[in-house]
């Protein structure tokens, strides 16, 4: 995944910078470098995925300007071919095009990128720093100010805690220049609603998702797939299996007692002919990993933490037992096509508003989870449902078509792939939350553990000291206390707990799990 960090002033304390930067070395264990630009420091931990030679090591330099980028730029070859008329390239790295691109187009370059990225540029001519993040926030970036008021940027909040008083996520779809954050893209906004008929919409969804998977299979390192047996990851794997000349490698995880996902994942793996691995996790592993997972994530959010337990342990197994470096996942489908709770949306307009809210906040929840669970194990996450062309198109589709008006949630996505991509029962399987589907017992163990830590009086007393995102269950209090241990006073990095829209009838619940909704039905079976 790589890790980047920047201190934007000439009076940097190198040892403090180095100490903060070391905290994310697992994101890029292949090589590390910190350089003094003359006006500050830039750091880079490398995980080599594209252009595996030493020439691909960052920071890249061009006439006194520098760039560090944690990113994947799709279709960079065409851009590089055009730039090669004026510039010389030394490596096969996709990120080497960034400085020539900046030289030609300035900050307008960010609108041109089909990429997931976080970057910091030092402009040697203007003697100033520019930072930017992709429109969804798939690649992480945080910022804060030190005691002297100097801005710092880093891949994770843990790099900056202790150096900056207040750490915040860098807003997706923005760049920073001259002391201001400027929005260059609002991926959730819709300029013109698409009123194509159902079959045309589904055809476009199919073609655009296939293209999104296709471009994410390109890597100089080995690629694998997380397969839960749910609709989203199963589609990614099925598409990839068709594109690959040999069996793809798929991985699934579940509790030893009651893993719902494992049987469905195996059914998909058998159907698409993948080389499939099942990993079993135990109650002891879950509880032993909890504090480390919260420290890794940098969140107190209940559903993010629950869903991270299985994902973290699975990625840990992959890191320790295979030579795979890249993992494709199924995140971002729910935000586009709907959750179980969006069945309760009172109107098409409300459905669309909720989808836009979820897309704009993704970087604090599911995208954060996937990034941290995968990167802490020195792997790279790629998210086909986050393909910019795909997201823009689905967001533009008439929301009346995206609502559950066909008797099945995510009907457009399911109908788009009817045929022989997946077994019918998988394609039309009811949604189950990942944290539930790895085994209902996992969430029950976490709740039970938290319940045993506090009396009712202690619970009420401890909750009172929190004003932002106040804990409301013993489980949420436990997570908050662990979070505060490693990120003291930084709770505003997360806007609030991820919960269904409580203003909708049927959604005023006290737990983020879809299990508590009246329409959960057969999802957990």
Question: Which residues does each PLM region occupy?
Answer:
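N-terminal glutamine amidotransferase
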Residues: 1-68, 72, 101-196, 203-214, ...
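Acidic-aromatic/histidine active-site loop/patch
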Residues: 98
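Short, polar/flexible loop-turn hinges at active-site or ligand-entry regions and domain interfaces
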Residues: 83-92, 107-109, 160-167, 300-302, ...
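Structural signal for conserved beta-strand scaffold positions within catalytic alpha/beta enzyme cores
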Residues: 44, 91, 183-186, 252, ...
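ATP-dependent adenylate-handling active sites, centered on carboxylate activation for C-N bond formation
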Residues: 8-14, 85, 104, 125-130, ...
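A short, aromatic/hydrophobic, helix- or strand-capping loop or linear motif
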Residues: 27-35, 90-95, 141, 405-410
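Conserved S-adenosyl-L-methionine
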Residues: 184-185, 423-432
